[in-house]
Amino acid sequence: MKTIEVDEDLYRYIASQTLHIGESASDILRRLLNVDGELATAAPAAEPKGIVVSKDAAFDTKIDGVKAMRSLLISDEFAGLKNAIDRFMLILSTLHRIDSASFSEATMFKGRKRVYFADNEQTLLASGQTTKPKAIPNTPFWVITNNNTSRKQQMVEQVMVRMGFPSDIIEKVTHSI
């Protein structure tokens, strides 16, 4: 049996394809790829042992996300930022780095009259010429910035809630903006 590393999103996809409890990762991949065990190796292992998927599989990601956000809050880089907009942008960039797929889903919310996040500047300008769109560093996303600190805090709170962060870290992060 060989061990391979896979991205979190690929792992979740493979795990979601489990048909019965105890099904190994090798069995799932063989089924998904339509590969017989005979073609895989010349001398197949007697009993393939792979990952066992549990309902808590995604829990580790949240712990890593919480650690990353706590590290951000105590970092010299974050402490050195003097204005709310810079802290806001760094928080959004960090959330994207933690889990880009969840971030993408979490940023789909809209206000009554405004779109807050988009993948291009024009979409944000279309919801108001005074939105002051800015690119979120190291992401393909743009965000409106012409709003008060309270609105920025609400935006971050919404994203973090949708990404599944616990309320205590959400509160710490939003109050740090």
UniProtKB/Swiss-Prot annotation:
Record's keyword annotation contains Calcium: no
GO annotation terms (biological process): negative regulation of DNA-templated DNA replication initiation; regulation of DNA-templated transcription
Keyword flag Nucleotidyltransferase: no
Keywords: Cytoplasm, DNA replication inhibitor, DNA-binding
GO molecular function: DNA binding
Annotated InterPro entries: Arc_rbn_hlx_hlx, Ribbon_hlx_hlx, SeqA, SeqA_DNA-bd_C, SeqA_DNA-bd_C_sf, SeqA_N
Main location (coarse class): cytoplasm
Subcellular location: Cytoplasm
GO cellular component term of the entry, any: cytoplasm
Pfam assignment, any one: SeqA
Function: Negative regulator of replication initiation, which contributes to regulation of DNA replication and ensures that replication initiation occurs exactly once per chromosome per cell cycle. Binds to pairs of hemimethylated GATC sequences in the oriC region, thus preventing assembly of replication proteins and re-initiation at newly replicated origins. Repression is relieved when the region becomes fully methylated.
Family recorded in the similarity comment: Belongs to the SeqA family.
Assembly: Homodimer. Polymerizes to form helical filaments.
Designated name of the protein: Negative modulator of initiation of replication
Organism (species): Vibrio cholerae serotype O1 (strain ATCC 39315 / El Tor Inaba N16961)
